[in-house]
């Protein structure tokens, strides 16, 4: 039987996997800011879809990536990209850099996404495996709810600060290491 910390570290990887829309509470403020820079509302809304396209691309590239880098390195890189790529808008509020930020976030999530499931499937068996896979799904929902709630409090400071929720990937990285 695996220790509690090992199980928690694997499950915590799923906390960030469905977080791409968490900062969407700030969308009206972002539309106002980027409209002043000459961007249409649809272009600003596209920023939130962009991460999903990057995740999809990474999932398609995953068989190649698995041959090039280890599972551990993939997870470490993924968490670092989520933390630093995802939180870039805290510092940089230009459309082009937020665009890059959303791509980096998607790449980071994509590096972890399939691994979060496969690690559990490879590490556990039987009832324990089923329980861990169920908990993993619950951790996704908990992560999304928690990050969205935090964004609700942060948005009053300013839209760019809502992206600081992606820094929660750093404590997850610390637990994983």
Predicted regions span which residues?
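Extracellular/periplasmic helix-loop-helix junction of adjacent transmembrane segments
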Residues: 27-56
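Residue-level signature of mid-helix packing/kink "hotspots" within the transmembrane helices
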Residues: 21, 51-60, 144-145
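Cytoplasmic helix-loop-helix junction between adjacent transmembrane helices
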Residues: 95, 101-139
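Extracytoplasmic
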Residues: 5-37, 62
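Conserved MFS/SLC helix-loop-helix module at the cytosolic interface between two early adjacent transmembrane helices
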Residues: 57-95
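Interfacial helix-cap and linker-helix signal at transmembrane-aqueous boundaries
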Residues: 30-31, 35, 65-66, 150-158
């Amino acid at each position: 039987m695996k220790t509690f910390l090992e199980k928690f570290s694997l499950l915590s990887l799923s906390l960030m996997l469905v977080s791409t829309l968490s900062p969407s509470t700030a969308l009206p403020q972002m539309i106002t800011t980027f409209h002043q820079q000459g961007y249409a509302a649809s272009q600003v809304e596209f920023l939130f879809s962009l991460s999903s396209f990057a995740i999809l691309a990474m999932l398609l590239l995953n068989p190649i990536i698995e041959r090039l880098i280890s599972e551990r390195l993939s997870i470490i890189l993924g968490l670092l990209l989520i933390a630093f790529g995802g939180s870039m808008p805290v510092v940089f509020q230009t459309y082009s850099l937020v665009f890059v930020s959303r791509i980096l976030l998607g790449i980071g999530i994509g590096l972890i996404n399939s691994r979060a499931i496969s690690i559990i499937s490879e590490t556990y068996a039987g009832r324990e495996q089923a329980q861990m896979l169920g908990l993993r799904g619950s951790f996704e929902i908990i992560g999304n709810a928690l990050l969205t709630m935090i964004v609700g409090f942060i948005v009053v400071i300013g839209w760019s600060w809502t992206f600081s929720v992606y820094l929660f990937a750093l404590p997850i990285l610390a637990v994983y290491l």
